[in-house]
Amino acid sequence: MRALPTLDSLARMRPPLGDPRAAEDTLTPRPANKSAVERLAADRAKYVRSTLGSSRGPVSEHRVPEAPGVQHRNPIPSALAPAPVARRAIARKPLRPDSLVIYRQKCEFVRGSDADCSRVGLMKKFFQGSGKDKMAVAPETTRVADEDKTTKETEATWTKSSQAAAARPASMLPPPTPVVAVKSPAEKTRVANEDKTTKETEATWTKSSQAAAARPASMLPPPTPVVAVKSPAEKTRVANEDKTTKETEATWTKSSQAAATRPASMLPPPTPVVAVKSPALPFEVAPRVPVGCSGVQLRVSRSKGLQRSQSDLSSRYSIAKAESDTFFKYCGLDPDVVEALGRENFSAGSDCVTLKVRSVSMAASDSSFSRHSEDGLQEEELLEQVPSTTSVVERNARIIKWLFTCKKAKETPSQKLQGPA
């Protein structure tokens, strides 16, 4: 597709009527009209500085030469002749190697065992860069090659020396060079002082052992006792434990001596300890037993190796038995009650004790107890009864039953109390 000529150009191209050569000019073939791109390329030399245009001359000079016998009156067709287009030279990058070259280089890299193949980068070897990149990489490659060469030479030297040492006998081998550790002056001084002190100590021990071996055993000094160094807190604790142990031993000794000197009848009755578990259970009457040492004191006495004699143990058991007998003799009553009733009234063969106990306890109770009750025994009938001897177990059982009845009557005042059966 080409541009159509304008009316002005057609009028100029039309030859005059009186010209005899107009028909010839009209019949001769004329060059095609230039397109807009061709006209722009022809006018480019006017406003673009190009090395190519300057070397070849202006673009307007490149015109199609006319025939010598043909003369054109109109200069426009010659100006419309196509002119060569000046193009700028573009620097292209080097092309990448084809796949075959890459494959060959990869095979050489894998097959080669030298350090050069392992040191050089695979990417730098495959893809060629510009001249500047090659110049920048060249010193590094040279340094790596030098290091590899030095390493190979060192390994070869060591291999030769080891083979030569293995080939010749041991008698021809040179003596090993001693390894001397370099020490600082302060370290040397400290080591010298330690060596000097060690030598002096050894000399002193040697002299003392020789002197001890030379003189007889009678002249030898007594051995120095080894004293364990204790802290102040440890000393205080041990002193307190010793003091407590001594006080406990003195107390036991005095009590055993006093119990051995006076008879069992003069021993004071123990105070019963009553522990109420629940309203449905009776009182638990327990005799007063001498309180023993605490756990710490027992451990201290055991650690000290304290041993009781046979007489001490027998006195302790006799005291416990005497107190138990006293408890059952006075029916577990308090000492003031026993004094009020009179100690002479408590005898093993008397049944009047039950009556006395009944009368005293009922006077102190808050219950509505009447002496003349229909369910229980009357006081006159008790006095008329003939005393009979009862066992200790039976008497204690009656007393415990009676105490339980008193407790229930105290809780429920409507219930009537009875004396011990």
Swiss-Prot record:
<dbReference type="GO" id="GO:0005634">
    <property type="term" value="C:nucleus"/>
</dbReference>
<comment type="function">
    <text>May play a role in microtubule organization. May play a role in cell spreading and cell migration of epithelial cells; the function may involve the AKT1 signaling pathway.</text>
</comment>
<keyword id="KW-0963">Cytoplasm</keyword>
<dbReference type="GO" id="GO:0051897">
    <property type="term" value="P:positive regulation of phosphatidylinositol 3-kinase/protein kinase B signal transduction"/>
</dbReference>
<dbReference type="InterPro" id="IPR025741">
    <property type="entry name" value="FAM110_C"/>
</dbReference>
<feature type="compositionally biased region" description="Basic and acidic residues">
    <location>
        <begin position="143"/>
        <end position="155"/>
    </location>
</feature>
<comment type="subunit">
    <text>Interacts with AKT1; the interaction is transient and follows AKT1 activation. Interacts with PPP2CA and alpha-tubulin.</text>
</comment>
<dbReference type="Pfam" id="PF14160">
    <property type="entry name" value="FAM110_C"/>
</dbReference>
<dbReference type="GO" id="GO:0005874">
    <property type="term" value="C:microtubule"/>
</dbReference>
<feature type="modified residue" description="Phosphoserine">
    <location>
        <position position="350"/>
    </location>
</feature>
<dbReference type="GO" id="GO:0000922">
    <property type="term" value="C:spindle pole"/>
</dbReference>
<comment type="similarity">
    <text>Belongs to the FAM110 family.</text>
</comment>
<dbReference type="GO" id="GO:0005938">
    <property type="term" value="C:cell cortex"/>
</dbReference>
<keyword id="KW-0597">Phosphoprotein</keyword>
<feature type="region of interest" description="Disordered">
    <location>
        <begin position="51"/>
        <end position="80"/>
    </location>
</feature>
<keyword id="KW-0206">Cytoskeleton</keyword>
<feature type="region of interest" description="Disordered">
    <location>
        <begin position="141"/>
        <end position="266"/>
    </location>
</feature>
<protein>
    <recommendedName>
        <fullName>Protein FAM110C</fullName>
    </recommendedName>
</protein>
<feature type="compositionally biased region" description="Basic and acidic residues">
    <location>
        <begin position="232"/>
        <end position="249"/>
    </location>
</feature>
<dbReference type="InterPro" id="IPR025740">
    <property type="entry name" value="FAM110"/>
</dbReference>
<dbReference type="GO" id="GO:0060491">
    <property type="term" value="P:regulation of cell projection assembly"/>
</dbReference>
<keyword id="KW-0493">Microtubule</keyword>
<keyword id="KW-0539">Nucleus</keyword>
<feature type="region of interest" description="Disordered">
    <location>
        <begin position="1"/>
        <end position="36"/>
    </location>
</feature>
<dbReference type="GO" id="GO:0030335">
    <property type="term" value="P:positive regulation of cell migration"/>
</dbReference>
<dbReference type="GO" id="GO:0005813">
    <property type="term" value="C:centrosome"/>
</dbReference>
<dbReference type="GO" id="GO:0043014">
    <property type="term" value="F:alpha-tubulin binding"/>
</dbReference>
<feature type="compositionally biased region" description="Basic and acidic residues">
    <location>
        <begin position="185"/>
        <end position="202"/>
    </location>
</feature>
